[in-house]
Amino acid sequence: MTTFTHINSQGEANMVDVSAKAETVREAHAEAIVTMSKETLAMIVEGKHHKGDVFATARIAGIQAAKRTWELIPLCHPLLLSKVEVNLEPLLETNQVRIQSLCKLTGKTGVEMEALTAASVAALTIYDMCKAVQKDIVIEQVRLLEKCGGKSGHFIAEEK
């Protein structure tokens, strides 16, 4: 059975020691879905939001968040990310925005948390910019889509 790597033999939370691990290329993809009204989504897509370009702001927020994950999540290592992408896709038929993030590096630990943080903060930024026009926006399905590299190997999430 797999054990929790962040818990020591006394049951205390600890940062994992990665000093003896080999450096490998690691990559992770994550997503979040933001559901809103048809009117709010149209305002964003048509560039009519009074706060400016919602997608550009959310993209930059997601990239910044990935780079600062280690400051937000207590046991994450500071990482030298080599690539961060945040893509936002309006899904007009369902009144949603699909946010997909990619983080990559050559290092001793994975980038799943960075990818998840990027997608989450991009979604939160959309909410923040749109809350004046709609309070009941829903952020959902924040999940890891894929990861590769490292000891645990390749993971691909099942389709939803």
Curated annotation (Swiss-Prot):
One of its GO terms (molecular function) is cyclic pyranopterin monophosphate synthase activity. Pathway: Cofactor biosynthesis; molybdopterin biosynthesis. Its EC number is 4.6.1.17. One of its GO terms (biological process) is Mo-molybdopterin cofactor biosynthetic process. Substrate binds at residues 75-77, 113-114. The keyword Lyase applies. It is an enzyme of class 4 (lyase). InterPro entries: MoaC, MoaC_bact/euk, MoaC_sf, MoCo_biosynth_MoaA/MoaC, Mopterin_CF_biosynth-C_dom. It holds the Pfam family MoaC. CDD domains: MoaC_PE (cd01420). The active site is at residue 128. It catalyses: (8S)-3',8-cyclo-7,8-dihydroguanosine 5'-triphosphate = cyclic pyranopterin phosphate + diphosphate. Keywords: Lyase, Molybdenum cofactor biosynthesis. Catalyzes the conversion of (8S)-3',8-cyclo-7,8-dihydroguanosine 5'-triphosphate to cyclic pyranopterin monophosphate (cPMP). PANTHER family: MOLYBDOPTERIN COFACTOR SYNTHESIS PROTEIN A (PTHR22960). Belongs to the MoaC family. Homohexamer; trimer of dimers. NCBIfam families: moaC, PRK09364.1. This is Cyclic pyranopterin monophosphate synthase. It comes from Haemophilus influenzae (strain 86-028NP).
